[in-house]
Amino acid sequence: MATTAGVPAQSGARNGEWHTYGGDLGSTRYAPLDQINATNFSKLEVAWRFKTDNLGPAPEFNLQSTPLMVNGRLYSTGGTRRAVVSLDAATGELLWVHSENEGARGAAAPRQLSGRGLAYWSDGKEERILYVTPGYRLIALDAKTGSPVPGFGQNGAVDLKLGFDQDLDVTGAKVGLHATPVVARNVVIVGAAFETGANPKSRSNVKGAVRGFDVRTGTQLWLFRTIPQPGEVGNDTWERDSWAYTGNTGV
């Protein structure tokens, strides 16, 4: 008889905090809190509100961000330029805001508005907030001040249209990301997305890729192609050399 060691199940977010988009790395989206229940739910009242109307050139109409809560602070994206805000969770006080005006690059982005949110990383000393702008740049911010981390990429930013295994127009290439980055230990994992809709306008759009970056320096560590190239597993399934010209394969 063979046995294997048991693996503990994900228990959900701890202490009422929410450190990742899915609550924990298992994406359980569960918090074992019991203060609010069926007997007192009807007595809840709004404690405070924060509006994102001024976080961009126009009011946002489709806020999809999931805020993070770390050490009593809320972090969220919001507004048409995908600004990042830090709020006091108890009072709603605005602690800091960071916004990138990407001009023509942001206007041409296939995935705009506030996106799904951001990611948090800490080594016990430093704390960082990481997110991807509409123009497809990975930004690292000091979680306490909102300032770009100077040792990450170039002045706190990594241009995701570079190092993409393809020559891309950094202004107009139709690739971006609506999702949050994923932090696994000291690696930030970023995918790619394209224009919404089930029927892409062109079969020869940008190819997708998933990449890992060093969370401290922004150095690209690895790249996984979603369309296998010659010599890679699965390339033979892309018949008539379609691997060479097709795209729109995001993750």
For each feature predicted by the language model, list its residue ranges:
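N-terminal export/assembly segments and adjacent metallocofactor-ligating motifs
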Residues: 44, 50, 84-85, 194, ...
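Repeat-blade elements of multi-bladed beta-propeller folds
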Residues: 18-22, 60-79, 83, 109-137, ...
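Hydrophobic/aromatic beta-strand positions that recur at structurally equivalent sites within the blades
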Residues: 36-39, 87, 141, 213
